[in-house]
Amino acid sequence: LRRLAAALESIWFEELQADGQLTGAFQPIVNASDRRTAGYEALLRARRPDGTILSAAEILRAARALDRITTLDVRARILALEQAKKHELHGLLFINFTPSAIDDPTTCLQTTWAVAERLRIDPGKVVFEVIESESLTNLRHAADVLAAYRQRGFRVALDEIGSAHSGLVWLSALQPDFVKINRQLTAGLAAVVTKRAIVAKLAELCRQIGARTIAEGLEDEADASVAVELGVDFLQGYPFGHPQIPEQMSDS
């Protein structure tokens, strides 16, 4: 039964890629100062023939089980660039990024660079967002991968600061252009003194090292307003827009 399940999962995963079922969902990121859209985070989704939408977690789980995470990582990156260009999503484009999925930074970079060049996308507008929990196993490798991307003009964000004790170590080693403050700190920010103190210090620290901060996972205006007061540069969350596939964005 286990072998049968693995075989079925493999067929399902191959169909996702071959049949054009993979798509992006884009969530706005807004300036804290005026609430205007500064860019979008590209999130991976899959649209099944019956119309149901699969989350990134479901897709990634299958990719890991089948040892296809590298293939998926490259495909997701190209897809985000192509859809952002096709649907004229202006501003910064944040693309989730898994350094551990990359064996050869130079080859991977060349693929991404070629797509950006073909689409005439300014690499300075593309931000590769390192998911901290995905990258804790090899700090040196992550730094090497990101250094290669920076040399071509791409920028780097560190995601989920505040979700693990090692976050400050990664902040020091990777020196990101943007830092995302985890929803564990932003949820209930207006009501919890301790969270406000931590977010204020993180915002100050990031300013000192030249990184701009994004409060993610915001669910109400009260928390968003406090984040602005504490010096956060950008806001992301449901008050400013849910993740939407391109067709939904065109209809809204």
What are these regions (language model features)?
Residues L1-A5, R36, A46, I131-L136, ...:
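EAL-family c-di-GMP phosphodiesterase catalytic domain
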Residues R2-A62, P243-Q244:
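Active-site core of bacterial EAL-family cyclic-dinucleotide phosphodiesterase domains
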Residues T70-H141:
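Catalytic core of bacterial c-di-GMP phosphodiesterases, primarily the EAL and HD-GYP domains
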Residues R48-I53, R77, L81, E160, ...:
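Short acidic-capped amphipathic helix/loop micro-motif used as an active-site/signal-coupling element
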Residues Q21-T23, G39-E41, L92-N96, K125-E129, ...:
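Structural preference for beta-strand elements that scaffold enzyme active sites
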Residues P28, L44, F97-P99, V130-E132, ...:
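Short glycine-centered, acidic/aromatic-flanked micro-motifs in structured strand/loop junctions
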Residues D73, A142, K195, V199:
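Short, conserved glycine- and acidic-residue-centered signature motifs
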Residues E117, A143-R155, A200-R207, V228:
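Surface-exposed amphipathic alpha-helices with a cationic face
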